[in-house]
């Protein structure tokens, strides 16, 4: 999606954004088609070989029973954000918080007190707790934001690098979440009050499998026909070359 002309980049960091696009182009070199995963249908760009498709979410995220519980859930790519969460929690000890972090040396559950718990990353537990939270705060990873959006959870995005900056800006522009520079849960609670579930995204996502399969099949057909035409043209060229050699030979023999 970073190569789609309609995607607006944040514009904060020109060099990292240029490098992100450059790296994306390198990964696409030689591709017959480029599948751009997006929370919205930006429309295909045939000139650039870009086909826009919904995110490919795990089936469990789409079928799990969900409800709005009494706690706020979060995910931190950078464990350093834990201090922000603790600082906010000290001022609001009655708000229940469950945060997942990438801290391998931490216990499975680090219970700070009755209303704040840090959890080591566990996919099954993460999904179950997301399904039951009332709001979700995260460092703007694309997949987790899309899962929360599908479940109808208000999201606060705290980007930690340029790719997440792009994800966060895109999500905020599409009213899928709000962006913050830190884990200020007050902002998330305010956003959640007026939040309405994004039914349009859910409908878009429900067609992910058929759209992606169709795009792959179309790319294969395009590649196959291209190779077939190339082989046909090479065969014709060889016949023409052979004919040009035969004609002079006949003239010599006739002479």
Question: What residue spans do the PLM features occupy?
Answer:
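Hydrophobic/aromatic beta-strand patches that form the interior of the parallel beta-sheet core
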Residues: 33-35, 51, 98, 119, ...
């Amino acid at each position: 999606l970073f190569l789609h002309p309609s995607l607006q980049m944040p514009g904060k960091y020109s060099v990292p954004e240029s490098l992100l696009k450059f790296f994306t182009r390198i990964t696409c070199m030689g591709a017959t088609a480029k599948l751009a995963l997006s929370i919205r249908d930006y429309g295909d760009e045939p000139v650039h070989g870009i086909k826009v498709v919904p995110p490919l979410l795990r089936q469990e995220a789409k079928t799990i029973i969900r409800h709005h519980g009494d706690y706020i859930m979060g995910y931190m790519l950078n464990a350093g954000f834990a201090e922000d969460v603790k600082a906010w929690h000290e001022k609001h000890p009655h708000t229940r918080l469950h945060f997942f972090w990438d801290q391998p040396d931490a216990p499975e559950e680090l219970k700070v007190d009755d209303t704040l718990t840090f959890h080591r990353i566990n996919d099954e537990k993460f999904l179950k707790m997301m399904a039951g939270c009332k709001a979700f705060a995260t460092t703007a990873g694309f997949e987790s934001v899309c899962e929360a959006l599908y479940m109808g959870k208000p999201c606060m995005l705290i980007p930690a690098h340029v790719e997440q900056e792009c994800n966060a800006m895109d999500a905020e522009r599409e009213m899928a979440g709000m962006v913050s520079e830190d884990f200020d849960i007050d902002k998330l609670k305010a956003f959640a009050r007026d939040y309405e579930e994004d039914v349009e995204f859910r409908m878009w996502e429900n067609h992910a499998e058929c759209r992606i399969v169709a795009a792959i099949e179309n790319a294969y057909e395009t590649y196959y026909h291209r190779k077939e035409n190339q082989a046909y043209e090479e065969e014709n060229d060889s016949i023409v070359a052979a004919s040009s050699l035969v004609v002079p030979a006949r003239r010599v023999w006739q002479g």
